[in-house]
């Protein structure tokens, strides 16, 4: 999805705000940071995404499926905006629940499909299928 479409959809989520990409970039970066933390990945932040750094992709931010752009990035940026906006604090809680649900679904459904180039080195979770237990109740004697 192009940056202009992302900005348009965020403004629609924000009940017709007219924020520019420059005003939303911080919130978009925060969402990408959350995604990277959840998926143990290194997708580029929007502030690092330019024609110079990604000439083959710019202006289409397509590092993961568009479904997650719509359901996680756009909703997450709207939530991050409402948290910072004094008038939006009552609305922020509804956006928070929706954003957290969608972030969890992204973790559940997309974790194994993160492209190799965007995976961090190492794992942040225990990978139980790498352990050679014969029976779950039998003590494992080493690796």
Protein language model features and the residues they cover:
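Conserved short "hinge" loops at termini or chain/domain junctions
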Residues: 1-62, 89, 108-143
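Broad hydrophobic/π-residue packing in well-ordered secondary structure
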Residues: 34, 53, 57, 76, ...
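Short, amphipathic alpha-helical segments
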Residues: 67, 71, 90-93, 97
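Elongated alpha-helical scaffolds
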Residues: 67-76, 80-81
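Short helix-capping/linker segments at secondary-structure and domain boundaries
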Residues: 81-91
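Short secondary-structure subsegments characteristic of cysteine-rich extracellular domains
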Residues: 92-108
């Amino acid at each position: 999805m192009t940056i202009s479409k992302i900005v348009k959809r965020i403004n629609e989520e924000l009940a017709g705000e007219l924020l520019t990409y420059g005003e939303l970039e911080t919130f978009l970066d925060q969402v990408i940071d959350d995604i990277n933390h959840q998926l143990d990945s290194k997708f580029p932040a929007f502030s690092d995404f330019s024609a110079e750094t990604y000439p083959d992709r710019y202006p289409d931010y397509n590092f993961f499926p568009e479904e997650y752009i719509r359901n996680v990035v756009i909703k997450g940026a709207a939530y991050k905006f409402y948290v910072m906006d004094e008038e939006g604090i009552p609305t922020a809680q509804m956006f928070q629940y929706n954003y957290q649900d969608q972030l969890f679904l992204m973790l559940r459904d997309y974790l194994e499909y993160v492209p190799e180039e965007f995976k961090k080195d190492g794992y942040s979770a225990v990978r139980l299928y790498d352990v050679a237990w014969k029976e779950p109740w039998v003590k494992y004697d080493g690796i």
